[in-house]
């Protein structure tokens, strides 16, 4: 494969991995530990 194709595939995989990790953190098991500032300061 050409170098440009390998670089493009690597960057794409990195972005997909980061997006997957962000979704897991936001909606998966670790989301229970996140604080909600709107719930802390109810009026």
Swiss-Prot record:
GO biological process terms held by the UniProt record: photosynthesis
Keyword Thylakoid found: yes
Membrane topology classification: Single-pass membrane protein
Compartments in which it is found: Plastid, Chloroplast thylakoid membrane
GO cellular component, one term: chloroplast thylakoid membrane
Keywords: Chloroplast, Membrane, Plastid, Thylakoid, Transmembrane, Transmembrane helix
Name of one Pfam family that matches: PsbN
InterPro entries (alphabetical): PSII_PsbN (IPR003398)
Chief location category: plastid
Regions that span the bilayer: 5-27
Superkingdom in the source lineage: Eukaryota
Function: May play a role in photosystem I and II biogenesis.
Protein family according to the UniProt entry: Belongs to the PsbN family.
HAMAP family referenced in this protein's UniProt entry, alphabetically: PSII_PsbN
Name of this chain's protein: Protein PsbN
Species, as recorded: Bowenia serrulata (Byfield fern)
Lineage: Eukaryota, Viridiplantae, Streptophyta, Embryophyta, Tracheophyta
Gene that this sequence comes from: psbN
């Amino acid at each position: 494969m050409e170098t440009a194709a390998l670089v493009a595939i690597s960057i794409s995989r990195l972005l997909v991995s980061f997006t997957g990790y962000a979704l897991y953190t936001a909606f998966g098991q670790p989301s229970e530990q996140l604080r909600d500032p709107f719930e802390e300061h109810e009026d």
